[in-house]
Amino acid sequence: LLEFNMLNTLENLIKLARERKSSPVEGSYTNKLLSDKSLSKAKVLEEVNELIEAVEENSNKIHEAADVFYHLLIYLEANDIKIEEVMSELEKRKK
């Protein structure tokens, strides 16, 4: 059940990013990130740093990890990097 929910959540996030990219919604934070690659890049860097701090301080780790996932997925989509291709690359690296 947990695995199903994880995959479902990830698929929904990817679907949201692609829907917002093809049909922008005014005022959407996701659309703001998709349309401003510089902002999207800055947010990925910021969120990774916040995650590192959270891990070191043992505080808010899950929240910050979720922020990293979200912002990275949006950054990839904004730059036309398909998550399927990333997953395929990871699959090739299995030993």
What are the language-model segments listed below?
Residues 1-65, 69-95:
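Flexible "arm" and connector segments at domain edges
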